[in-house]
A protein has these predicted regions:
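Non-catalytic, topology-defining segments of multipass membrane proteins
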Residues: 1-123, 127-128, 136-139, 143-166, ...
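Functionally important transmembrane alpha-helices
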Residues: 174-235, 242
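Membrane-embedded alpha-helices of multi-pass transport/permease systems
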Residues: 120-127, 131, 194-198, 218
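Activation segment
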Residues: 131-132, 203
Length: 250
């Protein structure tokens, strides 16, 4: 395979750099959002509260601990694929897209990657809720019955491994611009943080509108945490609706 083997020493340096970046990004994004929603007087928050009780310090500590562990897991495939890309062994590319087809693929590939990730997440997430698998694959995340923004990446190790490898593996054979990949990482992060915020930050009119009713927001995902069943999707309500697991909104 072109780009393989990759230099072990450089890959380790990249791995620890990515770990630091992921952890730093987590705190830089989550802390101000948590402060804006939970540390200010409720009347100043321009959002609809979903959680019935204040988050406890123990809950937040667990969310931060699991999210930090997940960072070490997410960094591994990212480091490997970056080193493979530098050696010409992936389908990632850089440079300014050319023409309508170039820019068209930038947009199309973004949707394909998002839908692929959403599909993978829906079915693996649903499988992890099986009673024989739940305790060692997904229980850690559900300790947050009323989640906070800190729960955005609080996964058990098995779940983190399952989620971390999909996009890097796709990047080995499905062309994606480096800028698109970075944008997807930001979308993934912001989406995860707001969906676990315990507050609905989007207007009800938009959520129930022609586009918003197909998108997963905190109103949708919060029910998954409180009921433990249904609403398994990541970005879109498509698979929940197709498979009959959509339980609506808070």
């Amino acid at each position: 395979m072109e780009g393989w083997p990759i230099p072990l020493g450089q890959t380790l340096v990249t791995y620890f750099a990515f770990t630091a970046i992921i952890i730093g990004r987590y705190f830089l994004i989550v802390w101000p959002i948590h402060w804006a929603l939970w540390k200010r007087p409720a009347e100043k928050v321009k959002a609809r509260r979903l959680s019935k009780r204040e988050p406890t310090a123990a809950t937040i500590r667990n969310e931060i601990k699991l999210s930090t562990i997940s960072a070490f897991i997410y960094a591994a495939p990212a480091a490997i694929v970056l080193e493979m890309w530098k050696a010409g062994g992936t389908a990632m590319y850089a440079g300014l897209p050319q023409g309508v087809s170039g820019w068209g693929w930038v947009l199309a590939s973004a949707f394909i990657y998002l839908f692929a990730q959403d599909t993978w997440f829906y079915f693996t997430h649903r499988i992890m809720h099986h009673r024989k698998l739940f305790k060692w694959t997904h229980e850690g995340h559900h300790r947050s019955v009323q989640p906070t923004p800190w729960a955005s990446f609080s996964f058990d190790a098995v779940e983190a491994v399952s989620a971390a490898w999909l996009l890097p593996v796709l990047a080995l054979f499905l062309p994606i611009h480096v800028g698109t990949a970075l944008a997807l990482l930001m979308i993934m992060t912001i989406n995860a943080v707001f969906n676990h915020a315990g507050w609905e930050v989007y207007p009800d009119k938009w959520i129930k509108g022609w586009w918003g009713r197909h998108i997963i927001t905190a109103s949708h995902h919060n029910l998954h945490h409180t009921k433990f069943k249904g609403n398994y999707g990541l970005y879109f309500r498509f698979w929940d609706k197709v498979c009959g697991t959509d339980t609506g909104l808070v």
